Amino acid sequence: MASLLYKNTGIDMTLALVGEKIDRNRFTGEKVENSTFFNCDFSGADLSGTEFIGCQFYDRESQKGCNFSRAMLKDAIFKSCDLSMADFRNVSALGIEIRHCRAQGADFRGASFMNMITTRTWFCSAYITNTNLSYANFSKV
């Protein structure tokens, strides 16, 4: 069951989504702050240029993270977020920034952080700093 809740916390609106399938362009290029996404499905979503700041993507009660598999995360920014147990399999993530986050047990198998310049020249870019990656899986990256 999907639910949506907006909480007015003064100037900002706080978004809380539970069990929701995120439409492809819903957050493309947006800035999302202090919001909660529990058991949400971002698979195939275009999150290019999207900034998530202070957001929760891990539901401690169910011990599940969100699904970002096959999402477009080009130049996406995650700052001070909890991405624990998130599924990032086969994402396109050139230029992604993950800073000051928790990403324990996150699955990055098959993630691509590169762009092909020519058939023999590749450019790779990702910034993952001050982030807890305990038990994260980066095989086939």
Which residues are covered by each model-predicted region?
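Tandem repeat scaffolds
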Residues: M1-V141
